[in-house]
Swiss-Prot record:
It holds the Pfam family GTP_EFTU. InterPro entries: EF-Tu_GTP-bd (IPR041709), EF-Tu_GTPase (IPR050055), EFTu-like_2 (IPR004161), EFTU_2 (IPR033720), G_TR_CS (IPR031157), P-loop_NTPase (IPR027417), Small_GTP-bd (IPR005225), T_Tr_GTP-bd_dom (IPR000795). It is found in: Cytoplasm. It comes from Yersinia enterocolitica serotype O:8 / biotype 1B (strain NCTC 13174 / 8081). It catalyses: GTP + H2O = GDP + phosphate + H(+). GTP binds at residues 19-26, 81-85, 136-139. PANTHER family: ELONGATION FACTOR TU, MITOCHONDRIAL, ELONGATION FACTOR TU-RELATED. This is Elongation factor Tu 1. Residues 81-84 are annotated as: G3. The lineage of its organism: Bacteria, Pseudomonadati, Pseudomonadota, Gammaproteobacteria, Enterobacterales. GO terms for molecular function: GTP binding; GTPase activity; guanosine tetraphosphate binding; translation elongation factor activity. Residues 60-64 are annotated as: G2.
């Protein structure tokens, strides 16, 4: 068995399986790796290898996730699959496994079920941009009309949550039969892989996005000015470019007059690098940790937003008691805590440890944010929850 060399030339795309318990997500994951390995080369992963997923800690939260990889001729995929419903909720909210697209698995024998709906809603809230449907267990349904009905229901459900239900690719297959090597069902897995290639666009790389650096520290260097340090989250900053300082106070413009890394001077700082950026005409006291340095106009400060949050269970080191409306924790964005108040949905009086919930947050100071930004909820420095900005309000 020759070891394949890792092809860096292929675009890398992150996907995952979502859907109701026992509809066949893990079987499908195994079938994809098996059929694609057989067709295009690569490694197959057996069902039981995927099913006993290792525990991971993301921001102090315990999540069971399996990671598999597979290739089509044009792309390399990293695929996540979770054994339990709670794991999906935590995974999607924390962004532990970011998905460029998801495969929604719906058993044709059952049709859409409560978790089908919940995973679609979560996908909408946390910004999963594309969903492809795999109708599973179609070998067990003889009635063509029933298949039509299930497909219609799934498309309606997607449309309800603002996904393009009418245009979403739907593949009718059987993960188990494909795994057992039956050619007509293997062909359905190849069809699914074709949709992964064609329907999910190549994700924009961090380096191609507008420049943003969360400020971790501020120094003044006599005779040179003020330096901010941090890790460039996205984009590139070049010496001589205009930048904005956003968040906590009024937005201020400045010019980058130097970039340094490990005491060496550079022409630019790129996504992923820890750099110091020298700013023209800015006083040390004008700027603080928690603000961001960004390409002018690319990000705005906000105080009010709709969010999807997961509250840690007692076992995860979270609260031991529920909280109620009027709860005022700190919200930790990038590098700093900001106090905020919450509004719970209509009819929800309290939130228990281990729950996930939609809530509106009002911060006492503005933070540079876009939809999809992750945050932690803290009480006196201890993490009690994780969340994602679903929609900026003001």
């Amino acid at each position: 068995m020759s070891k394949e060399k890792f092809e860096r030339t292929k675009p890398h795309v992150n996907v995952g399986t979502i859907g109701h318990v026992d509809h066949g997500k893990t079987t499908l994951t195994a079938a994809i790796t098996t059929v694609l390995a057989k067709t295009y080369g690569g490694n197959a992963r057996a069902f039981d290898q995927i099913d006993n997923a290792p525990e991971e800690k993301a921001r102090g939260i315990t999540i069971n996730t399996s990671h598999v990889e597979y290739d089509t001729p044009s792309r390399h995929y990293a695929h996540v699959d979770c054994p339990g419903h709670a794991d999906y909720v935590k995974n999607m909210i924390t962004g532990a496994a970011q998905m460029d697209g998801a495969i929604l698995v719906v058993a044709a024998t059952d049709g859409p079920m409560p978790q089908t709906r919940e995973h679609i809603l979560l996908g909408r809230q946390v910004g999963v941009p594309y969903i492809i449907v795999f109708m599973n267990k179609c070998d067990m349904v003889d009635d063509e009309e029933l298949l039509e009905l299930v497909e219609m229901e799934v498309r309606d459900l997607l449309s309800t949550y603002d996904f393009p239900g009418d245009d979403t690719p739907v593949v009718r297959g059987s993960a188990l039969k494909a795994l057992e090597g039956e050619p007509e069902w293997e062909a359905k897995i190849i069809e699914l892989a074709g949709y992964l290639d064609s329907y999910i666009p190549e994700p924009e790389r961090a380096i191609d996005k507008p420049f943003l650096l969360p400020i971790e520290d501020v120094f003044s260097i006599s005779g040179r000015g003020t330096v901010v340090t941090g890790r460039v989250e996205r984009g590139i900053v070049k010496v001589g470019e205009e930048v904005e300082i956003v968040g906590l106070k009024d937005t201020v413009k400045s010019t980058c007059t130097g970039v340094e890394m490990f005491r060496k001077l550079l022409d630019e700082g790129r996504a992923g690098e820890n750099v110091g950026v020298l700013l023209r005409g800015i006083k040390r006291e004008d700027i603080e940790r928690g603000q961001v340095l960004a390409k002018p106009g690319s990000i705005k400060p906000h105080t009010k937003f709709e969010s999807e949050v997961y509250i840690l269970s007692k076992d995860e080191g979270g609260r031991h008691t529920p909280f109620f409306k009027g709860y005022r924790p700190q919200f930790y964005f990038r590098t700093t805590d900001v106090t905020g108040t919450i509004e719970l949905p209509e009819g929800v009086e309290m939130v228990m440890p281990g729950d996930n919930i939609q809530m509106i947050v009002n911060l006492i100071a503005p933070i540079a944010m876009d939809d999809g930004l992750r945050f932690a909820i803290r009480e006196g420095g201890r993490t009690v929850g994780a969340g994602v900005v679903a929609k900026v309000i003001e």
